[in-house]
Amino acid sequence: MALLELRNVIRRFGDFTAVDNVSLSIQAGEFFTLLGPSGCGKTTLLRMIAGFDVPDSGQILLDGQDIANTPPEKRPIHTVFQSYALFPHMTVADNVAFPLKMSKVAPAEIKKRMEKALEEVQLSRFTHRFPHELSGGQKQRVAFARGLINRPRLLLMDEPLGALDAKLREDMQRELINLQKEVGITFIFVTHSQDEALALSQRIAVMNLGNIEQIGTPSAIYGTPANRFIADFIGKINLMEARVTQISNTAMTLEINGLGTTVLPPKKEIQAGDQGVIAIRPEQVAVHALAKQAEIPHAHTGKVLDFLYVGDVTTYVIELDSGIQIEALLANSSPGRARFFEVDDPVIVSWPQEAAQFLVDRP
């Protein structure tokens, strides 16, 4: 049985439906992420799990018991917010111990569990400091320690890394993964950052307009997106309009606007005449000098419009002879070499046939 199960959960605010008939299940010990753009309903869903909001209909089951109308203080759930929510007049030790003091736990037990929680987040030396004496990352770890001290069944995190700089955010991601493995508590993480979701999660639910578009592992979400929205939202991708012209038990022939035909394996739900897009990730696009054209099958000629050098990789924007623009991501493998091609260089682009996916448009 799943630790947490949502069944047909709906939440409306007037005429606006923030969460639209959402169902999902989360296993014990899982690191699960709700990912989506601003306004997609992910925070509203998290608030209903926490008990800060109540669904208009549907069930929220924890260990098989419906808690949709249970007050937040009666749920074995803790929430960590982006703002840390630390008491400025309390030391680190007192901030972490606060939930146990409110529960009237014995002082000796409080001290033992407080020290254990701070050890788990590597802050044992900071017990007597106040929040204003801590860095952003240290404050966030205090918030995590306070969330874990009661050993909740679920730890909910509402964009907890959003206020940190890029380097600190990356460090905290590693610490969160290790912390979750160590304590074994189910983490539910809310973010609009695709990179955070892919780096942290065992499974991801991608939300849009109050609906869950796809649930899967990071590699499945990134590698086999269910539709155009997910393909475009998760990482960079090239999308080219296409139409299915023929389909059989063994092959599906597509006409790509401006690029001719390509053949892909068939899919059960796709029929001849279906419109959609061919999706190809930039890192799957190869770029060659024009002189190699005869050696490369299924190649397309064009010229470099622009490039972005970021140290380890360079992203090229290439305009094909047909007018279609393609992005390609190339590793800067040669030491000290900033890039391979210049603006206006004539080039050839190609990609493995198996790298292309057809995503059908559905109403």
Swiss-Prot record:
| One protein family per Pfam | TOBE_2
| Main subcellular location of this protein, as a coarse class | membrane
Quick one: which residues bind ATP? G36, P37, S38, G39, C40, G41, K42, T43
Could you tell me which PROSITE patterns the record lists for this protein? ABC_TRANSPORTER_1, ABC_TRANSPORTER_2, POTA
Q: Which CDD domains match?
A: ABC_PotA_N
Q: State a GO cellular component annotated for this protein.
A: ATP-binding cassette (ABC) transporter complex
Instruction: Give the quaternary structure.
Output: The complex is composed of two ATP-binding proteins (PotA), two transmembrane proteins (PotB and PotC) and a solute-binding protein (PotD).
Protein name, per record? Spermidine/putrescine import ATP-binding protein PotA
What is the gene called? Answer: potA
